Amino acid sequence: RGRRHRNWRPDLIVLDDIENDENVNTPEQRRKLKSWFEKAVSKAGDTYTDIMYIGTILHYDSLLNNVLQNPRYKAKKYRAVISEAVNTKLWDEWESIYTNLFDEDHEAHARKFYEEHEADMLLGTEVLWEEKLSYYDLMEVKISEGEASFNSELQNDPIDPDNATFNP
């Protein structure tokens, strides 16, 4: 079942975003993907073959989440927000301003509020890649795209607070 080029087997296998909303949707689809990975991918190389799996956790029983928890693999899970703001009251106030659609300049007013309270609002925060997405940018995404998308796509934590039995 191993793959080879002449007498050589691959020394690196790269899996990039192989899961999508459809193939993690049902237990049967997740089982098939896991079986393919265990029987085909992990057996395609040799003892020296490295497997690099890059992706977003779309379901708690997804292949990626299972690989992350498998002691056979060295795994690293990244989150856009490493630590949240300490001062949640200011962020709640900012959110009220940002989401006030009766105010035509709500985004500018929210930005002004943030700039006036920036030091207090950023207290305790840490983000993965500040140059790409600041904490402010990430909070805009969280509000505009919703917590379910934010948690799954940027935090690698597929929690949808609207469908959770207990709100985290």
Question: For the regions a protein language model found, what residue spans apply to each?
Answer:
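Non-catalytic, compositionally simple segments
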Residues: 21-168
